[in-house]
Amino acid sequence: EGNVGIPWYRRIFGLSSSTKHEVVKDRINTVRNDVLAFGTIPEVSQLIAPETSAPTQTVESAALDRAAASVVEILGAAEQCGYTSTGSGFVADNGLVVTNAHVVAGVTSPVVQDSRGRTWPGTVVYMDTEQDLAFISVPKLPLEPLTIGTNATAGSLVTFMGYPKGGPFKALPATVQGIGNTQTIDADTGRANAMRQVYQLAADVQHGNSGGPVLDENGNVVGVIFGKATTGQTGYAITASTLKQALAEGGDNTAAVSTGTCRK
């Protein structure tokens, strides 16, 4: 079984009202719900396409510079499991932030923080664990929404943004190695969930990047980071078409939804 998409969490205690966190230690969360399997292929690197090294060539554009201001960090106390998860997200509509479902699993009161350190309380209004997408409503968020583009093609040079290892903000290059369909394995039942369309990226994805956007040179969102391979510089992202479908289903939601349970 190939292991990819393993969410990582920074274990933190004592979340204060000013959202200052004392980092106690890093904890790898080996949740099988975010482990992908593709037939009997044993190597993660062979899930979609052969691995290549992450690119060093960066994409520079005014559009990407503007997009960076709409990429946020997600902080949320998962009290049942005794840790605070950190991840990334981005504004997809007025007052609506996209992130991964595993970032806010078991979190009742997420906090959104921008690169300037400003924070806003949010409410999870959409949760899809099969596609690993969640939406957070932040009505007072003064950040501009990003445009959702079309799916990237294999060989495309893209940029992914987020807050690896709990920050600071970083924008790094990636190459789309391939796009394909796979399934997640439910951690509780062992049964396969619905098919998930994903990119395989040559990218130095780290814990904390989960939920961050993958963008083209025009600053359009073409994907959402959700995991990495256990070895090498290979990351995985949800496609723009999957994100668009989720936004059509739950982008207008305003009521809080259950975030399920966190996983130790």
Regions found by a protein language model. Give the residues of each.
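N-terminal activation segment of mature serine protease catalytic domains
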Residues: 5-90, 109, 248, 253-264
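Extracellular/periplasmic catalytic domains that process cell-envelope and extracellular macromolecules
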Residues: 64-67, 91, 127-129, 151-153, ...
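Active-site region of chymotrypsin-like
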Residues: 68-75, 134-145, 170-263
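Conserved active-site neighborhood of the chymotrypsin/trypsin-like protease fold
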Residues: 78-83, 94-170, 254-257
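Short, small/polar residue-rich loop motifs at catalytic or cofactor-binding pockets
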Residues: 83-86, 106, 206-210
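Residue-level recognition of short loop/turn positions
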Residues: 88, 94, 116, 217-218
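Conserved hydrophobic positions within beta-strands
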Residues: 89-91, 122-124, 176, 214
